[in-house]
Amino acid sequence: MSELPVPELPVWMGDVDPSRIGFPLPVDKSRYAKEVGLVYKETGRGPLHLDAYRPRDAEHAPLVVMIHGGSWHQGGRYEMGLTRWAGYLASAGLAVVSVDYRLAPETRYPDSFQDVVDAVDWCVEEAAALGADPERIGLWGDSAGGHLALLLATSQTRDDFPGPRLRAGAERLRAVVAWYPPTDLVRLHELASRGEGGSGMVRGFIGADPEAAPGRWREASPLEQAHAGAPPALILQGTRDLLVPHTHTARYAERLAELGAPHEFHLVEGGVHGFERVGPGDEARALIERARSFLRERLGAAG
């Protein structure tokens, strides 16, 4: 049998050994059923899809909505290790949906965020078919997906948020897990402009410079929307992240602490962007397990 090719890694992963890429924990596929390509929304650019993972031994299971990363410009529900992640959660008794959303630069904020909001509303309406409890919803996202997950969790539980809103009500949002998430978009844009890290794709997502649309930049930043009543958050970040500097994410955690908002913040020494898929070793595995247990605890999963 020939060996699998070693993938080429993007420059922002630094000097990680490519042979270490992969999801480090086992997934028991016998414990869940998967349905792919469900249409949750029609748009002018075609339908938007999600994949559903339903635990075989659980009815009315807590639901986790997974939002992929890719700097808001690329990626999809079937990429970036999400299928393994979804299976890992579903095998622990959590119903999971992994969603697509329209990408920049063709789609700008708030339309891509509206897609994520609409996906949650669709899941509430279709909860019975998903084997899910619509009153217990958790959010999960990595990178840009972590940003959208945090924005959804913080904004929808405010009365004064001017952007897209859930029809179903925000009280059902019980927890959010965000891996290396952009949280202060203006700051991230400034860092990228000076060549000090950060993603230069933020402007493409917003569609204007901060000076031209300051309200839109503030509206789209979880740091600006954070408040004490937001759902509990688990935030995970590496110190060698070249896209989302760890000081950026630490500032968000500090803001949550100042507000008295429930949260956990884990900073992984030497962790790169995507560290849970490339190490470092035992700590990454422990944090993956913690992410699953956090969702189970906060959503009240049985067993």
Region spans (language model):
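Alpha/beta-hydrolase superfamily serine-hydrolase fold, recognizing
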Residues: 1-303
